[in-house]
Amino acid sequence: MARFTLPRDIYHGKGCLEELKNLKGTKAVLVVGGGSMKRQGFLDKAINYLKEGGMEVQLIEGVEPDPSVETVMKGAKVMQEFQPDWIVAMGGGSPIDAAKAMWAFYEYPNTKFEDLITPFGFPELRQKAKFAAIPSTSGTATEVTAFSVITDYNTGIKYPLADFNITPDVAIVDPELVEGLPVKQVAYTGMDALTHAIEAYVSTLHCPYTDPLALQAIEMVLAYLPASYNKNMAAREQMHYAQCLAGMAFSNALLGIVHSMAHKTGAAFSTGHIPHGCANAIYLPYVIRYNAKNPAAAERYAEIARRMGLEGICQQALINSLCEKIDEFNVRLNIPKTLKDFGIQEVEFKEKVAKIAELAVGDACTGSNPRAIDPANMEKLLTCTYYGTEVDF
């Protein structure tokens, strides 16, 4: 039996942040990130709307990019002391992801982080609070998904948490929040959204409910991401909706090894963190070429190319056109082609690649990839992404 789960309510359109005043409760914890929501005035608006609805508000500020286990545990302690009946998370993927994990530890204080790593092994939530999510970037779609990514900086590993319990009750998708996004963030989050949609479409768990969402998201990203990058506000609004559609698709169809690789390389190298969307953008064309050795996956990649109007007289030509389109976008968005171009040192890459490959194969996203992979082939694939060599296996 398959399952298709979405938030109960998705509000969209300019100014829909105001819907916060219609949440029914007495206390709300508001979780935010590094300060952009405060600088742009959206944090004050959110607080005022919640108070207008009759709620007492407690802030948790300063959630870092790629939130840590420590940040989650500190936030959960604040929640345990305040006892909210609504958790409201506003910002990029990081504060929303962190708040989802805080939610679990708020409701179950004796749970250990290790207990939550098992996919779809969460205890029942909503015993104490409901959850509202307000994205300020156009990529992660965590406002509509059953996922959260938390980083253990002691090991350098990102852990994707997965359970339908952490799908928010309410998503508020207000495009006004993304009008001030820096162009680099537009690029990375936009390619993250494209990766979500493509991986969902070829996933082993795709279904008639997820396919239309994935295809529509792909079409919208290809149509609007370049203009969004060039600060066209109408395009940014459409990208905000596209990433949400992609999230609805992948939350139910799951993902693939592009994300497995990104999760396990993001914090692995001493030369610096690889932003998640940037890693996805680098890996995506290589993974398509690897997965396309599977006939079923090849046909679905070709179908994406057909739907997008790309050229190709045969299946392989269509797949090549799709990869070339992704390469073209990466160039236009100033995203490196390889890990070497990103700045990862060759000595360190060679030293760590075998272990990274082993961890990536064990990632929660690997199971729904359309073509099986073992550590040896994962190491070969990662090596291709480092040097930019052909995927011929």
Cite the ranges covered by each PLM segment.
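ATP/NTP phosphate-donor binding region
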Residues: 1-86, 339-340
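Glycine/threonine-rich beta-strand-loop-alpha-helix active-site module
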Residues: 70-176
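Glycine-rich phosphate/pyrophosphate-binding beta-alpha loops
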Residues: 139, 244-280, 363-368
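Flexible, glycine/charged-enriched surface loops at secondary-structure junctions
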Residues: 204-213, 227-238, 253-258, 274-277, ...
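Gly/Pro-rich interdomain helix-loop hinge
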Residues: 268-271, 277-351, 391-392
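Short, amphipathic C-terminal "tail helix"
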Residues: 348-393
